[in-house]
């Protein structure tokens, strides 16, 4: 077997030759990227590890353990399409399951359910959201009890500090429709979205999120939301990668990043199939990204 280091060199040279001389270079390059993924996984230079302990469980993160391997990845996969192809191939070559449910079987009796607490303000809309979230959690083995708070910030703080397992907060709670206040509360409390629901109001609908520090991602997730500190050029490349993976970008926003002077981009992605390849792409090429949530709309 050729050593991984030599294999990377051969693949890189082949890629350079393809770029300069061969016809149908895109087809040949695709094969080289696939071979790169195989070598990465087979050599152990790339590892996939499930999240354990206090965190968003049910996902696996990928890491490149060799600086040389990472250098070859960056050299061979400069475009969004190549990056997407590499991560799809890595997904295929890895055998571990992404979905690790703590409670894989639906539980039908309240006496079997584990009690969790959700913090929220007291009003008709939050109560309506709580009813939907309670039914959702019960299907996955949890019985929800409400902890009343005076403000949305207090509810988010309760989930962040461990006084509650979740908080129930509206996404569109600010003048711009959905953005600053909501994402600030998530960021400051290190909270992630577990699921969302639309609640009817007299003026339309308000989307509420169930957010917490620790929960299980479920198979029915249809939305992947993340943020990354980057520039406009890289943000455009991320959009191309998302499209190449077969997903749909539903929403993109940019905010001034605190203490840095740059921009923080938020991406909301509609998933087609699994999210593993997208997560791998972010792990490898944008390791400073922050997961906002992987969830479904109930």
Where are these regions (language model features)?
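Domain-level signature for soluble enzymes in the chorismate/prephenate branch of the shikimate pathway
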Residues: 1-298
